[in-house]
């Protein structure tokens, strides 16, 4: 088992976009060891190679396909055997639509929820024993959500996240589900001193959004990094770190 002297952070979807930018920012501090997760070994190793030149942190590629329980279980077993525990889990990976242009409505909902909701729920449940095994004083689970998942502002005629501007019912509802899962997990795990916090990066220029967006991936990663590493559990409990990198109270 490898000796870990820095907090160990696992980031899903870390080979591109917000996940890669988050890994980059954490790696640049030299204060964290990273598990760089992607759907394939090739993608994970490619991301590690790009990150290696800018850090003295340990970078370990790991394969995680959120649509496959066996993949998640195998990844957890690898982390347990290699490191013994995990300190911070960042559930970043997600999709906004089915990859099948001919998918039915039911198939489209299922594809997005499979990754964005079921995958995140299974990741958290599977890696929770490793978080419980951690001796780190500030264990965290960060779930990446979206302002589009906030039900109240979907009605607003003035909000940039209004349903009048962005319909996207499948993606929006998947992020609403993540918000509720996060709230329930936060309350449940508070007594174990494991913080569950949400981060909403905003509309960023990544492949996820077709290269469109008002923020760079680097800007979008900042709320994720803050949620993962800054503030106290008391300060962050029940909060969301929004796309302006500020804390939002209950009600999202």
UniProtKB/Swiss-Prot annotation:
- Mind listing the GO molecular function terms for this protein? oxidoreductase activity
Matching entries from Pfam families are given as:
adh_short
Entry keyword annotation includes DNA repair: no
List positions binding NADP(+). 18, 65, 92, 171, 175, 206
Phenotype reported upon loss of the gene = Does not affect the annullatin D biosynthesis pathway.
Top-rank lineage group of the source organism:
Eukaryota
> What is the top EC class of this enzyme, as a single word?
oxidoreductase
Alphabetically sorted, this entry's keywords are: NADP, Oxidoreductase
- Annotated catalytic residues: 171, 175
Q: Which InterPro entries match?
A: NAD(P)-bd_dom_sf (IPR036291), SDR_fam (IPR002347)
Name the EC number(s): 1.1.1.-
Tell me the function of this protein. Answer: Highly reducing polyketide synthase; part of the gene cluster that mediates the biosynthesis of annullatin D, an alkylated aromatic polyketide with a fused dihydrobenzofuran lactone ring system that exhibits potent agonistic activities toward the cannabinoid receptors. AnuI does not seem to play a role within the pathway.
Give the family from UniProt.
Belongs to the short-chain dehydrogenases/reductases (SDR) family.
UniProt name for this protein: Short-chain dehydrogenase anuI
The record lists the organism as Penicillium roqueforti (strain FM164)
